[in-house]
């Protein structure tokens, strides 16, 4: 009888410990919104890596410190071409209608390449720090953020003719990330030097400005249907949410330091923020006014730029691509994080 009672007590203890252990481990298992599933080496790439561009089967990576634009085939998961001679490349966009690749240089030019051969078609001089690029497929226009102080503006290129348009929007401070409305006429632009967000009406050319209490606002994403703008700041490190109608800040949550790219996953109502601190901040949008931190996904020190554009490639997986600069113990690479529901 004593042996039986002892066995029962032991079984009960094991069951309780197992239950508690399962309860403690289940949240971390459930909260894995991003899973590292691969990496694509960037051979011979040194220095800082800047922004990403996409077409349905390729990724374009601006290797700023290497003066190259790297072309990755998603199916093969390897670099298939390296465009040399691009002085400090920053923003990059692909125009599917014209099969052209546009690459912005910190030296002031935008280079235009054939999207198949990658032969240089022409370059356009914007006279200072051509940075972020955005493409409007409806008008076949490439929007270019460029300049400093008096020259700072968002200009435009006709993707069909390869000509710079006379029309531009003067801002008085260098624009970092900016987003275009697709169903409206506004552009939202981060102006970290003036601690503002500029709101540009493309039809009337009117520009309003939202003053910020946060500083160093670089990356940005737009949830157009819900009228929400997501902005990451570096001082302090925050992911802030703004009402695009009123300019009012709805929320501000702590996030990764040294952020440079931010994306909104409309299917899962999530925000991904990549930062040089060495992880990716993932937030959940509970509704348009309420947000919570979902996970801190490890990446690598200095990995502050990323690319996300929803389902891509033949398999149709949602993936976040994170640029990891070369270090003494490893080469440069693009890490692949598969998005989990």
Which residues does each PLM region occupy?
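N-terminal secretory signal peptides that target proteins for export/translocation
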Residues: 1-6
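Bacterial N-terminal signal peptides
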Residues: 7-19
